[in-house]
Amino acid sequence: MTVRTRFAPSPTGLLHIGNARAALFNFLYARHHGGKFLLRIEDTDRERSTQQAVDVLFDGLAWMGITPDEEPVFQSTRQARHAEIAHHLLAQGLAYRCYCTPEELQQMRDQAAAEGRPPRYNGYWRDRDPSEAPAGAPYTVRIRAPREGETVIHDLVQGDVRVANAELDDMIILRGDGTPVYQLAVVVDDHDMDITHVIRGDDHLTNTFRQAMIYRAMGWDLPAFAHLPLIHGPDGAKLSKRHGAQSVVEFREMGYLPEALNNYLLRLGWGHGDAEILSRDEQIQLFDLDGVGRSASRMDYVKLQHLNGVWLRQADDARLTDDIVARLADRPDVSVDEAVRARILALMPGLKERAKTLVDLADSAAFLGRHVPLAFDAKAEKLLTPEARAMLGELARDLAVIEPFDAPAIDVALRRFAEHHGHKLGQVAQPLRAAMTGGATSPGIDATLAALGRDEVMARIGAVAR
């Protein structure tokens, strides 16, 4: 058997991290077993499903490196097939026409509630002759639910889950306007796409009993089901905006790398020993459903940020530079040309050591593209005393003649200058850093000066020296 999994989102908004994790697990499971990962867009809600939302979805998955092995399937193009199955069940006597009006259905619900029963359809038209219906009356199509025994789902995460068939009602599979309901469309699509494993959030678990009715009525084999626990906020409550970012787009804009988000989402509810940092190849090699827990996971934004810092330090300097240049291009106080790009690239090994996100990285690199005179923050102003400014004027004469103007030579010159004037190295480096950056922090001062280049260093010292 070739494993075939699918991710089947409704394009009605941003790609939520819960859905992103489901997509990741489906992708990794298929890759681990040498199978295929498919994408189905459940866009039957035409009012809420927009092309913009579809584009955002595709972009988010591509950014995460989750790519389908076949062309995406759009559920809205398959409604004729869904209706065909409904009419087949009708012809086989496994479904029937229901002529109840909305008012009659509401009366059934009200009566059931008054009697302490679940408010659902009572099967009024299940065994009645359709000739009893008023001529031309609209109808829905309902499947005949089993009334005896129980339905058992052998879930690969949750274990055996069962429900008494008496608790299942004759659900609608075709609406009065002839359009299929979600439960029918999902089953038909999964069957036709040869899906072997349905891996999704456990908020779909109760749907599985209803979908199993359709599979069995059609005589189709059920796929294996695996229902993943949901992601909660740090406080254990349902993840919401008050907790922080919820969508892939938000995390991307906040400066998270796709490798870090993938790594974090994988470890959120799945375990394999003590391994925390896993490459994509390692994820594919190790991932299987037996490592998925049953309990809801809690989002830990601090841990995600830590992981992102680890992945930043491992990332290619040129790739990070491209991202930072793009982020700085929108800042009015920063100019980014090829010379500034070269400075950022040269200093990237030091810049990324302190950063937790790409936003941090852009903030720390911004001084490389600012023009003289720089604006100084409070810490820099405190460092740039009249005495420090005079000292920098003297230092400039030494820096002007360094050859080559690189980090090792600069380090030697700074140490020699400090020793000659009876200063500790920090007493020289800190005011110099303030003059170069407008702040009090940067990578090593020797590397910072080398990245700026002699002309820019002299210009920045000249703007503050007395």
From Swiss-Prot:
Main location, first listed in the record: cytoplasm
Alphabetical list of Pfam families matching this protein: Anticodon_2, tRNA-synt_1c
GO molecular function annotation: ATP binding; glutamate-tRNA ligase activity; tRNA binding; zinc ion binding
EC number annotated for this UniProt entry: 6.1.1.17
'HIGH' region, short sequence motif: residues: 9-19
Residues involved in ATP binding: 241
Domain of life: Bacteria
Cell location: Cytoplasm
Sequence motif: 'KMSKS' region, positions: 238-242
UniProt keyword annotations, A-Z: Aminoacyl-tRNA synthetase, ATP-binding, Cytoplasm, Ligase, Nucleotide-binding, Protein biosynthesis
Record-level GO BP terms: glutamyl-tRNA aminoacylation
Reactions it catalyzes: tRNA(Glu) + L-glutamate + ATP = L-glutamyl-tRNA(Glu) + AMP + diphosphate
One GO CC term, this protein: cytosol
Disulfide bonding pattern of the chain: none
Stored InterPro entries: aa-tRNA-synth_I_cd-bd, aa-tRNA-synth_I_codon-bd_sub2, aa-tRNA-synth_I_CS, aa_tRNA-synth_I_cd-bd_sf, Glu-tRNA-ligase_bac/mito, Glu/Gln-tRNA-synth, Glu/Gln-tRNA-synth_Ib_cat-dom, GluQ/Sye
Subunit relationships: Monomer.
Function: Catalyzes the attachment of glutamate to tRNA(Glu) in a two-step reaction: glutamate is first activated by ATP to form Glu-AMP and then transferred to the acceptor end of tRNA(Glu).
PANTHER family associated with the record: GLUTAMATE--TRNA LIGASE, GLUTAMATE--TRNA LIGASE, MITOCHONDRIAL-RELATED
Family: Belongs to the class-I aminoacyl-tRNA synthetase family. Glutamate--tRNA ligase type 1 subfamily.
Protein name according to UniProt: Glutamate--tRNA ligase 1
Annotated organism of origin: Gluconacetobacter diazotrophicus (strain ATCC 49037 / DSM 5601 / CCUG 37298 / CIP 103539 / LMG 7603 / PAl5)
